[in-house]
């Protein structure tokens, strides 16, 4: 499996997705609020907001929650002002880690993120220390129930960079600027998505096993458990055999 989707699969197998549903809602509400603040409250004219709303709907977030978050972003309702920050660092075994945060208290967040790195045998670095190891891409994940040839043809005609046949799924990669066009073309052709988002794809992977693998999973878990953390990207690769030992 490609590394950029490895963690979401691991997390799902660990059963963490449902256990952290409340935190997922909190993070999505923040993203919707900030997206509406920056680009306006109309999802049709605001690609970032549309992506956030689509993700919220996929998580079965109530419509009222979504609408309130948009109104807080546009100023129609009073809400907290969030600041977007990206922290960078190294996990066990030299794994590159990007941590995207939204916070109303920068000092609190940086202290908590730094402490989490340290407790899991990693260390926080300076801005720019690992971001060059990742490429910003659109990623659309589909189940293997769909027709690959039709998917490949439709995606590339719409402007996708690549369509990959991975172990458990198909993955469509796009330039961020082409993401909406490709997603809409696939929707129009009737392809159901498992997920569709703008993400950070690592250029190279670091293979982990033993204690380093165990500590890396702890680091990912604890970072994502922080309410101020929106997304965590890392370039680690753990074999299926190693995962079975850890789980």
Swiss-Prot record:
Q: Which GO BP annotation is one of this protein's?
A: regulation of DNA-templated transcription
Keywords for the protein's UniProt record, in alphabetical order: Cytoplasm, DNA-binding, Transcription, Transcription regulation
> In which organism is this protein found?
Geobacter sulfurreducens (strain ATCC 51573 / DSM 12127 / PCA)
Family designation: Belongs to the TACO1 family.
Q: Does the keyword Phosphoprotein apply?
A: no
* Pfam families xref list: TACO1_YebC_N, Transcrip_reg
Which Gene Ontology CC terms are recorded? cytosol
Query: A Gene Ontology MF term for this entry?
Result: DNA binding
Ranges in coiled-coil conformation: none
Task: Enumerate the InterPro entries for this protein.
Answer: Integrase-like_N, TACO1_YebC-like_2nd/3rd_dom, TACO1_YebC_N, Transcrip_reg_TACO1-like, Transcrip_reg_TACO1-like_dom3, YebC-like
Q: What is its main location?
A: cytoplasm
What is this protein's name?
Probable transcriptional regulatory protein GSU1074
State the compartments where it is located. Answer: Cytoplasm
| Entry keyword Cell membrane | no
UniProt cross-references to HAMAP family, sorted A to Z? Transcrip_reg_TACO1
Tell me where the transmembrane regions lie: none
